[in-house]
């Protein structure tokens, strides 16, 4: 059954961990067990030097959201290895 899971990582490394996880999923032929890997962000307008600038800000710094069909094999071979190799 597919469910959403929050995976904790170092703040600022979310995109690197996401890329590593996606690469691992493909290389281990586990794509059918994963639907989405997301770093939740939102567009925010901030004022810098008197000008409004639109930036992308992480909603949950230090977390990835993953929609997957989790089992022990997936956790040990894919997710845990990616997290250890941050």
Predicted regions and their residues:
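Acidic-enriched and Gly/Ser
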Residues: 1-86
